[in-house]
Amino acid sequence: VGFFALASLTLPTHAISITAAGSAYTQNFDGLAASGTGMTWANDSTLPGWSLFKQPVQGTAMSTYSAGTGSSNTGGFYSFGASGNNDRALGGLGGGAYFGSPDPGNLAGWMAVSFSNGSGGSLDGFQVSWEGEQWRNGGTASAQTMVFEYGLGSSFSTVTSWATPGGLFDFSSVVNGGTAG
């Protein structure tokens, strides 16, 4: 498993507040570390509103991440980018003990962003867009996919139903097979 992701609409204490219809939120991840391993990650704090979770128990909070260029095959959450460059991307590699050694093709973890309705009224929809980046080819013949889902609840662990709007919202690796790296 090479890539994985999840975005959610939940309402934790540090959720990103949407204060009016048509409000925009952007995140470029450039505030993440550009070098090092074992950096402290605190859900809803390192990046306000963002959380990292892993299997085997849904909702197990992660406490570390590393910076990388895609050259490592060690499973974990990463701040990907060129060495020493502050232009970052949040992602992960799904293998290894970090995620409880998931079987190939199984979900390894979640990257979740939380929003709350701070408008004082009803919000009847939302629009989502992002740019996916591939920082590593795991060498497998099949594409590795980040799946977009959303749910409503007071926290990640209280969401009982996740909606998957379809494959057009997912990101699949564009380079597959060949030599890993």
Predicted regions and their residues:
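Acidic glycine-/aspartate-rich tracts in secreted/extracellular proteins
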Residues: 31-37, 135, 152-156
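Surface-exposed, low-complexity/disordered Ser/Thr/Gly/Pro/Asn-rich loops and linkers
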Residues: 48-121
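Exoplasmic/lumenal beta-rich domain surfaces
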Residues: 77, 82-84, 90, 145-181
